[in-house]
A protein has these predicted regions:
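Glycine-rich loop/turn
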Residues: 1-29, 37-47
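Conserved NAD+-utilizing ADP-ribose enzyme module
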Residues: 23-24, 40, 44-169
Length: 169
């Protein structure tokens, strides 16, 4: 299976960054099987970095081959859609930096800006989880695959990278 990672640099050797707090499935290396989504991620990161550094920044997508058959030998959690279990994991991972779910790989929907707003309402106690699930059923939500352990990263093979855009300050 081909996977993509959007960034501002080529990522030939993926790593799990412990500095990225508040991610949907906790500390992990995040990919997607949707090329256009990875390109949006890359352009968004380039825009943020360009504003911060006041320099031109390239948006780069790294491409990987994933040996998904190896997932059979790993702790693999897959969500087919929005569910109570998915929401509870996202809320827990976003609100508790010390939380470790124990999975090598987690695949599921990504909490984009609209979804993130709903998740934050749940985290703040403004919205019940049941109401959030109902609201999220109508959202078009993209996919993400999070590689949460070094063992999981060894099933990911870098193929190439390409520039999908450039952002000026």
């Amino acid at each position: 299976m081909i996977l993509y990672h959007g960034s501002t640099m080529e990522v030939s050797q993926p790593r799990i960054l412990k500095s990225e707090i508040g991610r949907d499935f906790g500390f992990a290396f995040y990919t997607t099987d949707i090329q256009a989504q990875a390109e949006r991620w890359a352009r968004r990161r380039a825009m943020i970095e360009s504003r911060r550094t006041k320099t031109e920044i390239q948006a780069i997508v790294s491409v990987y081959e994933w040996d998904d058959s190896a997932a059979k030998h790993l702790q693999f959690l897959q969500f087919d859609g929005v569910s109570m279990e998915w929401l509870e994991l996202v809320v827990t991972c976003r609100s508790r930096t010390d939380y470790s779910h124990g999975y090598d790989i987690v695949e599921g929907k990504i909490a984009n800006d609209n979804v993130g707003e709903t998740v934050s309402y749940v985290m703040q106690g403004i919205m019940r989880k049941e109401d959030a699930i109902e609201r999220l059923r109508f959202e078009k939500i993209n996919n993400q695959i999070a590689f949460c352990t070094e063992t999981a990263l060894r099933t990911l093979y870098f193929q190439n990278s390409y520039i999908c855009g450039s952002v000026n300050p």
